[in-house]
């Protein structure tokens, strides 16, 4: 094992999600709407559920309507458990 790997702690399996920014009015925080699609066990119909999560945006670069990728992280506040990884597509 190399010394570089000994000193570096491994991040556990973190959830990476993609969603649209619906609010950027808070300082260094964005609200991202995530869509989850599941097939009903008995009837097979696709069911869509939406959830909104707060994510940390250190540089405040994301705007409303942007498609962003967020990653799970340690709790940053009461409601914030995600951080912005990248902006996949800017809003038009």
Swiss-Prot record:
UniProt-listed CDD domains: Ribosomal_uS17 (cd00364)
A GO MF term: rRNA binding
Pfam families xref list: Ribosomal_S17
Presence of keyword Cell membrane: no
GO biological process terms held by the UniProt record: translation
PROSITE patterns xrefs: RIBOSOMAL_S17
InterPro entries: NA-bd_OB-fold (IPR012340), Ribosomal_uS17 (IPR000266), Ribosomal_uS17_bact/chlr (IPR019984), Ribosomal_uS17_CS (IPR019979)
GO cellular component, one term: cytosolic small ribosomal subunit
Keyword field: Ribonucleoprotein, Ribosomal protein, RNA-binding, rRNA-binding
Protein purpose: One of the primary rRNA binding proteins, it binds specifically to the 5'-end of 16S ribosomal RNA.
Subunit structure: Part of the 30S ribosomal subunit.
Family the entry assigns: Belongs to the universal ribosomal protein uS17 family.
The protein, known as: Small ribosomal subunit protein uS17
Organism: Corynebacterium diphtheriae (strain ATCC 700971 / NCTC 13129 / Biotype gravis)
């Amino acid at each position: 094992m190399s010394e570089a790997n000994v000193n570096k702690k491994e991040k556990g399996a973190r959830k990476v999600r993609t969603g649209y920014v619906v609010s950027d009015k808070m300082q260094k925080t964005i609200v991202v709407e995530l869509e989850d699609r599941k097939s009903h066990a008995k009837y097979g119909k696709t069911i869509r559920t939406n959830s909104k999560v707060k994510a940390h945006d250190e540089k405040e670069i994301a705007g409303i309507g942007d498609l962003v990728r967020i990653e799970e992280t340690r709790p940053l506040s009461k409601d914030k458990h995600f951080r912005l990884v990248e902006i996949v597509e800017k809003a038009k």
